């Protein structure tokens, strides 16, 4: 890179690739037309441009085609719609590449001296390490605080304990120490409890969008225990076998054909009321959206042959894609307030009842369990003023927790939120 000459890059062919280049040049010279079918994003466009340059191709007559899935229809359509190389994408890739080299060449020697030889520092790697270090410092400096929370299991005042009819509720007040908590428990022992209020609110839950590279990596980590690198290796095999669309993408869009096929499948399998066609807006700050979202090439195929990991990942992609085009789930969220006759402290119970399962019939998105449990309890039917008995009331000491260390999934999520890196960089990083 010639920094003094407007950062002009100079490219060299590696010695071990000279034979391949020679063979390609001969094949190109013997051909009437050369078709370049590298990926549609800026990295793929740069590859096409480098090939044209090395093979000394006439850009005006060279056919540039792109497709996002290895199917007969997709390839045929690409051949019918060739275009020229997009130099805007090429220049964009060159700028990123030059920045990568400048950052790496400047920082890596410092690592060799201060840490150990052969370490590398990249534009994305360095930021990822910084995030991990900052989180570790937060954990080290965190000071835990304790309190006591009181929870009770209540049930309607009937002659016997009804099965599956208990209400788990938590006291609205937190107690500073064991002495305060014990005093409150002594107050609860002879107390009379009743339902002082009920709030019922209808609500909906919407499906997650189809997978991008980063969301596939995150969900495969949560649901399947796959590392980021493992996910990309398995996805590559599925793509090369023509089972899924291109696996390096930051788009959540589906093609019109995919939407039609998915809708037909949902109506046939689950009925019209379960179908809701929708497109999702990509949230990533740096999204190129050169491709579709990651989806099955044939939505009607719910399973594939292959290794167990390939089957698992395909099923995950299939379910997520189908669910994204299904109706919202309809829920009823209930809050029950329980009062006591000898204290202003109330107990609160919350629960959720699914009235219509919608997309949940097929798929439910996982989340990083960094903030504790997120269970949805089904509450028994009660009325305001109804007397309640308690089965148990206990006090538990709780400690505030430091922020958790990043997992591979949560680190990828953070990088994406900050607009750092591209789908192709997350696995190597």
Model-flagged regions — what are they?
Residues 54-59, 106-110, 192, 239-248, ...:
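A generic secondary-structure signal for well-formed alpha-helical elements
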Residues 40-44, 68-73, 154-159, 250-254, ...:
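Conserved nucleotide-binding/hydrolysis micro-motifs of P-loop NTPases
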